[in-house]
């Protein structure tokens, strides 16, 4: 939505999913010719929204030009809502928030969070298939990437 000042809130970078999401963020910046700004990247060490909010709030105070937040988990998305609200930033008007995962907290937030989701049924079936394959003699470890979907809700705006 034309944002150029996009911050990324990650969690536990040593988790593969967190690393992959971080790489996607960096790749998207490059693809859209947006320079990476290290001040727009933080890693929170907890899934606890209130603690995430403290770190996100500090980042927004130090970088008030940020117009969008991408959160690697829905719990950090809740922390982002708290931080923005405390700073008087209107979500969906002054700042956009997009989170990965959902829909656990989607119905509990105001405005509802825009989310990047994955086909859970497809992933579950693939996980079972991979587990069953592990019993075979010539098993080789494998990975599987599923195409994500963006579900746009009230937490984004056009710049």
Predicted regions and their residues:
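Conserved donor sugar-nucleotide recognition element shared by glycan-biosynthetic enzymes
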Residues: 17-21, 48-52, 120
């Amino acid at each position: 939505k034309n944002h150029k000042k996009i911050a990324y809130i990650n969690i536990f970078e040593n988790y593969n999913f967190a690393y992959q999401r971080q790489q996607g963020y960096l790749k998207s910046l490059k693809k859209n010719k947006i320079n990476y700004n290290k001040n727009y990247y933080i890693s929170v060490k907890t899934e606890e929204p209130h603690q995430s909010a403290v770190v996100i709030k500090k980042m927004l105070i130090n970088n008030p030009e940020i117009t969008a937040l991408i959160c690697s988990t829905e719990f950090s998305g809740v922390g982002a809502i708290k931080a923005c609200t405390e700073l008087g930033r209107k979500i969906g008007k002054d700042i956009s928030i997009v989170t990965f995962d959902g829909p656990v907290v989607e119905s509990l937030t105001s405005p509802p969070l825009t989310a990047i989701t994955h086909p859970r049924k497809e992933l579950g079936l693939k996980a079972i298939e991979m587990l069953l394959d592990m019993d075979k003699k010539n098993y080789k470890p494998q990975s599987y990437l599923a195409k994500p979907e963006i579900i746009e809700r009230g937490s984004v705006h056009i710049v």
